[in-house]
Amino acid sequence: MRGHVGIGSDLAPAYSGMADGTAVTTAPYVSLDITDADVVRRVISDVQPDAVIHCAAWTAVDMAEDDDKVAQVRAVNAGGTQHIADVCKKLDCKMLYLSTDYVFNGQGTEPWQPDCKDYQPLNVYGQTKLEGELAVSQTLEKYFIVRIAWVFGQNGKNFVKTMLNVGKTHDTVRVVNDQIGTPTYTFDLARLLVDMIESDKYGYYHATNEGGYISWYDFTCEIYRQAGYTTKVIPVTTEEYGLSKAKRPFNSRLDKSKLVANGFQPLPDWKDALRRYLGNLVARS
């Protein structure tokens, strides 16, 4: 359940209270079990928010496939989301729910449109995130559902950190080249989410960084190029790579044109995002 670590931790610094100058960064951190409806109701009602940004999720995709984990994954991604949506309805506040391209079947080459309803999740994670989406859209009118992909940021585990660590200890690495998408930098995403909740332009959106669609192989090559690594990157197919318990989408292309159409600023190029991110990692090390 790492969603709040990866994205939520970048939200507070991004938000300074546009309406009244009140800094969210001064608000206390409260640990909350979103699977407990009574606790969710009490904690959120005590705050009386104008908007709730729901980042918490079970994101361990392969572990979610374990028979003894499925109920827990569903309790978090679907049940917890329903609890939050119910409180938002009672309080008449906005809700923003972060979701994923995994709600689709991951096939083809055409970018997925935000308002596409051709849902065919490939795995338990995708199915439960879809159930979370439906909980929000069927409960509320004032909601944003924002799908993202290939997330990386300062906190939590992510692909960039993993490949940097692997590159330090291996002369060569094998990376899949037939899964296509675009990375999302949490620092950039947080600023977009703030803009969204200050608006009333509700609905479904896709939000990844700009710069076109790439493979994990392409991403790794750029990570090593910018980091100055000499590690050789070998492209392989998903079938050749193997190992994954949960099915992965080949097509994670998300169409983001609705953002601009509704007046939102697109996220910067992913290569620029990666450059800034690597710079921050060095500064913090």
How should these model regions be labeled?
Residues 134-181, 187-188, 195:
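NAD(P)-dependent short-chain dehydrogenase/reductase
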Residues 250-285:
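C-terminal amphipathic/interface module of NAD(P)-dependent oxidoreductases
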Residues 192, 199-244, 250-251, 270, ...:
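Mid/C-terminal beta-alpha module of Rossmann-like enzyme folds, strongest
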Residues 37, 81-84, 133, 193:
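Conserved internal alpha-helix within the Rossmann fold of NAD(P)-dependent oxidoreductases
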Residues 9, 52-56, 95-100, 105, ...:
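SDR active-site strand-loop-helix element
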Residues 34-76:
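NAD(P)H-binding glycine-rich loop region in Rossmannoid oxidoreductase-like domains
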Residues 71, 75-80, 90, 103-146, ...:
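Catalytic helix-loop patch of NAD(P)-dependent Rossmann-fold dehydrogenases
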Residues 1-51:
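N-terminal Rossmann/SDR dinucleotide-binding element
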